[in-house]
Each structure stands twice: as C-alpha cells, then as structure tokens.
Amino acid sequence: MPITSSSETFASFFNDWLCRHRQFVQQLAHLADETTIVTPIEEESLVSNFLSHYLQYYEEKSVAMSVAGDDIYDFFSPPWLSSYEKLILWIGGFKPGMVFKLITTSVNDLTSHQIDQLESIRLETKRRERDLMRRFALLQQSVGDPLLMVPFRRIGVLRLGEGEQPEMEDAMEVLKVEMIKAMKNADQLRCVTVGKVVEVLNPRQSIKLLRAAGEFYLRLRDLGV
C-alpha cells in the first residue's frame, strides 16, 4: 500500500474544507442580503462558525507541516492551489493586509471610532508583515535558493563530494525547521489580523466582510481551475 505524503494528506483535507467553504459563503451571502430578516444571535453564530472553519484550515496545516519532511516546500507553493491563487501568495498564504482592502469595498457604515481602531490594526499588521518578510528573505538568501535545490536532491542530480553530504543534510534540516517557523509566524499573523478586525466590527459588518473575503477567494480559485 503506497505511503501518503503529508502534502497529499493535507490536499485531501483541503478539498473537503473547500466544499464547506462554499457552503459558508452561500450562508454569508444570504444573511448579508438586506431583505433577509435575521436576528443578531443568528448573525453572531454564523460569524463564529465561519471563523472556526477558517482557523481549522491553519490548525490542520500546522499539524501537516510539522511532519512534512521534504514536503515542507510544497506548502510554500501548494500544488492543491490554482494558478490564480498562487499569484497572491505571501509566505505561503494571503497577505494579512489584504483584509483592510476588502473592508474598504464591503463595509460602508464604519463609525469614526471603528475607522481609528482599524487604522491602528492596519499599521501594526504592516509593521509585522515587513518584519516577517525581511526574516524570510534572509532565510532564503542564507542557502541560495532551497526551493530549487531540493527537487534536484530528490532525483539525485545534485552530487556532493565525500564528507559534504552529512553537512548538507544537517543544513537542510535546520532550513526546514526555520521554514516551518516562518510559515507558522505568517499564519499566526493572518489569523490574529482577521480576529482583531472582527472584534472591531459588529456582527452585520463582519458578515459583509467575511462574505467579500470568501467570494474573492472563490473567484480566484474558480478562475484558475
């Protein structure tokens, strides 16, 4: 029986997750409709359920990366994503600051206090994005281009001299650990940013934002498939 790789296992999870995502977006669109009569409790429940669904993706991804081995590089350019989805990748996922652009186009009833709060979150997010990107760039530069080197190692094209193989293996193990750390830090910022933004918004505004985000993602997905 063939052994299933970590990335293949996650790809299977992702396909199921994507089906649920489409269902959630339909629910968000229904509740976002101005003609839909809905209670605040129903709005809060859907927002909470969608955020749990969103976090599940990153929880499963974290587990998969922890046991990925050489497959860790698949998570930086995931084969389960479409070509259009890959166009917006930032350290293996969406750039956290994208949420603020979506707010601008989807939520038109922000109070002045909310605007100030969101601006503060945006600036902090931008600062952390720069910090993470700087560290990630240094990590890549430290080994040349590991994302190109590893596929060659897999098929035996890269020939090392006697005594160099153990050193290269050790270096690659350190690299994998650092790559996982970089991805998890980026994923944490993605989750924290969305969480902070939703805390500022009321349930109705959150539904509008999450609907816009969900539909934007599905458009990218469907265009590239």
Curated annotation (Swiss-Prot):
Keywords: Abscisic acid signaling pathway, Activator, Transcription, Transcription regulation. Pfam families: DOG1 (PF14144). InterPro entries: Seed_Dev/Stress_Resp_Reg, TGA_domain. One of its GO terms (molecular function) is sequence-specific DNA binding. GO terms for biological process: abscisic acid-activated signaling pathway; DNA-templated transcription. Residues 7-225 form the DOG1 domain. The keyword Transcription applies. PANTHER family: DOG1 DOMAIN-CONTAINING PROTEIN, PROTEIN RESPONSE TO ABA AND SALT 1-RELATED. May be involved in the regulation of abscisic acid (ABA) sensitivity. This is Protein ZW2.
